[in-house]
Every structure is written in structure tokens, then in C-alpha cells.
Amino acid sequence: MLEIRNVTYAYGERVILQELNLQLKEKRIAIIGSNGCGKSTFARLLNGLLVPKNGDVLVDGLNTRTEGKAIRRKVGFVFQNPDNQIVFPVVEEDLAFGMKNLGFSKDTIRQRTQEALSRYDLLQFREHPAHLLSGGQKQLLAISGVLVMEPDYIIFDEPTTLLDLRNKRRVAAAIDNLSQTVIVVSHDLDFLAGFDRVLVFDDGRVVVDDIPSIAIPEYVRMML
């Protein structure tokens, strides 16, 4: 479970998130809201990429202030632009990087890399320059890079925003088939209809917290 206890976050004097208190237990959670409302900042707090000014974020009881490395193994993060997650130019090397960094054995690295590439039909590109992949393939590579670490939670920041319709469907299907707890920041409301819970952010606060059939129409009314 993810717990947010009286969390406030600010950039300098500008308060981005205000006194948030939440428990996130559901398997599929969506975060929506207008640009600048604090949703992406909130997502980064959940895996320790950012640390709150006040309050605490707990992941299965571990505090992001003191257990950052352990939490980043438990909570994977897929960025909006998959180019931001490409570390090495060759696909196979890029997938192996995180595991090598954490001391995984060569056999484990080889096995998990092959499984991840096979899952999304990327095996033929294992020695391919990563930057030459299509947008959809890059996003699937980014998802693979998180999956090889075997996290318990995966956070996606606008995973379909930069993709055409065909690749949006492909990436959405990949996310839908994940066994991990998934938290998605998105403007793609159709994609979120099957989720368990939707948090609507406005001005640094959660103003709606409900199932999609209630939260999404309320958000649409707010935007009118």
C-alpha cells in the first residue's frame, strides 16, 4: 500500500501540493487534472524521485525520505517521453543497465532481458539502435526496462500522449495486462474508464476521489 501523510510540496515559494492525506490500495489508479495542478509532481513523490517539504510518503511501510534505493526497486516509473529513459544506444544494453547497476547475475540479466523483449515483440531489435525505434516501440522498451526490475508498483506519466492511435492502443493493452499495481497520470479519459479509482487534482489538492464513472464526468464538468 502507498500512504501519503500530510504531504506538502513546493518549488521555492510556490506551493504545488497541499496537505495531502491518501491511502492507495487499488490495483488500477488514475490521476487526472488540468496542466500545472500538481499531478506529475505527486507521481514523482510516490517513488522517491522527489521528497516532500512536509509530511511523509510510505511504500509498504518504507519512507521515501530514508529508503530511497529500496523504494525505487519496488516502484517503477515510466516517463511521458521514453527518450528520457534511454541510457545506452543499443536496445539490449539499455534494458540490462538497471540490473547491472543493482548487481544482478549475468544469467538473470540475460533471462529477464530476453523475456522482456519477447513480451512486446522487440526481440528482433535487441542489437538495434534504441533511438531508431518507433514511438510506440520506445514506450514498450521503457515499460520493459521497468518490468525487468520486477517492481510491485509501476507509475506511468502520460504514457500515450505522444503516440498515434495504433501505438496508443498497443501501449494501453500492455499496461492493461500488467500484474503489478498501476498508477497512471493521463489526459486520455477513455483509457482510464476501466480503472478502479480516479483522483482528480486541482490547485494542488485532490478535489474528487471516486470510481471512473463518477470521477471522470465530474472532471469534465469542472473543465467546462
From Swiss-Prot:
Main localization is membrane
| Keywords, in A-Z order | ATP-binding, Cell inner membrane, Cell membrane, Membrane, Nucleotide-binding, Translocase, Transport
Q: How does it sit in the membrane?
A: Peripheral membrane protein
Its transmembrane ranges are none
Binding-site positions, ATP: 33-40
Asked if the Swiss-Prot or TrEMBL record annotates the protein with the keyword Cell membrane, the reply is yes
Q: Provide the protein name.
A: Putative ABC transporter ATP-binding protein plu3849
Q: Which organism is it from?
A: Photorhabdus laumondii subsp. laumondii (strain DSM 15139 / CIP 105565 / TT01)
